Amino acid sequence: MQNPTQKVISFSEHKADIERIKKEIEEGWAIVKLVPNKDRFIGLLEKISDPKDETIYIPPRKKIIMN
């Protein structure tokens, strides 16, 4: 079975959720679509082949700080 190239995510603004999404981005996933749904966000992550060659979309007013 192949590894997925896209996956659906759901998260809130809680620190644990943000850390989980931050880890996904560090592992080479990019947020390609993100919509608010009450107190959560529903989105689509897409695996990027070479993170250095691709841009990563971060939605307006949402900052994910990578140290």
UniProtKB/Swiss-Prot annotation:
InterPro entries with a match to the protein in the record: DUF2674
Pfam families assigned to the protein according to its UniProt record, in alphabetical order: DUF2674 (PF10879)
Superkingdom of this protein's organism: Bacteria
The protein's name: Uncharacterized protein RP158
Organism: Rickettsia prowazekii (strain Madrid E)
